[in-house]
């Protein structure tokens, strides 16, 4: 499985997931008004969001 780890004007960066990690995730955490910290990567299970964030998971490549 290959997951996107970052997006920018220059394109995307990806990561090959380790054995047992079969989910890609994207997590947004609110840092301030209209300001979010976004992290992406591989996971064995979908992580849970905290009270200031949101998580989206998928099990497909990129």
From Swiss-Prot:
InterPro entries assigned: Snake_3FTx, Snake_toxin-like_sf, Snake_toxin_con_site, Toxin_cobra-type
Primary location recorded for the protein, binned into one broad class: secreted
Localization: Secreted
Recorded GO MF terms: toxin activity
Keyword Disulfide bond annotated: yes
Ion transport found in the keyword field: no
GO cellular component terms, semicolon-separated: extracellular region
Entry comment describing in which tissues the protein is expressed: Expressed by the venom gland.
Pfam families referenced in this protein's UniProt entry, alphabetically: Toxin_cobra-type (PF21947)
Residue pairs linked by disulfide bridges in the UniProt entry: 3-24, 17-42, 46-57
Domain of life: Eukaryota
Record keywords: Disulfide bond, Secreted, Toxin
Subunit note: Heterodimer of C8S2 chain 1 (AC P01410) and chain 2; disulfide-linked.
Family recorded in the similarity comment: Belongs to the three-finger toxin family. Short-chain subfamily. Aminergic toxin sub-subfamily.
Task of the protein: This protein shows a synergetic toxic effect in that it enhances the toxicity of other toxins.
Protein name per UniProt: Synergistic-type venom protein C8S2, chain 2
Organism expressing this protein natively: Dendroaspis angusticeps (Eastern green mamba)
């Amino acid at each position: 499985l290959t997951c996107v780890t970052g997006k920018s004007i220059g394109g995307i960066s990806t990561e090959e997931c380790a054995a047992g990690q079969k989910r890609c995730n994207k997590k947004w955490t609110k840092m301030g008004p209209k300001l979010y910290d976004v992290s992406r990567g591989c996971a064995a299970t979908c992580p849970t969001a905290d009270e200031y964030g949101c998580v989206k998971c998928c099990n497909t490549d990129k």
